[in-house]
Swiss-Prot record:
A single Gene Ontology CC term: magnetosome membrane
Annotated function: Plays a role in regulating magnetite crystal size; partially redundant function with MmsF.
Lumenal side: 39-50, 94-111
Compartments (UniProt record): Magnetosome membrane
Principal localisation: membrane
Modifications made to the protein after synthesis: Probably subject to cleavage or degradation.
Family per similarity comment: Belongs to the magnetosome MamF/MmsF protein family.
Any further remark recorded for this protein: This bacteria makes up to 20 cubo-octahedral magnetosomes of about 45 nm in diameter which contain membrane-bound crystals of magnetite (Fe(3)O(4)).
Membrane topology summary: Multi-pass membrane protein
Protein name according to UniProt: Magnetosome protein MamF
Cytoplasmic side: 1-17, 72
Mutant phenotype after disruption: Deletion of the probable mamGFDC operon leads to a slight reduction in magnetic response and slightly narrower magnetite crystals.
Amino acid sequence: MAEAILLETENTPCGCRSYLMAGLSYLGILCFVPLLMSRDDEYVYFHAKQGLVLWMWSVLAMFALHLPLIGKWLFGFSSMGVLVLSVAGLASVALRRTWRLPLVGYFVALI
């Protein structure tokens, strides 16, 4: 199971630009910057796709506010989940790893 979540990064470039772009992937709408600028870098593209899924999740959570009664709760839990997963993604970039985030990794495979 751990092999499916943690991918090896032996052949990733060690440039500072790659890690900066990968870090931008988890900062909301800034996920589009590495997605459009670094399509040839596999390490950055992996993190950008995960950041895109997290951003789409946060946008969908905003629409949940329009639901009566449970909208605020759904938005709160979704926002908390996105925040925790974004911090986990930033930690994986800081550790120079490619870690499939839980639940997000499934949707990234569909992109």
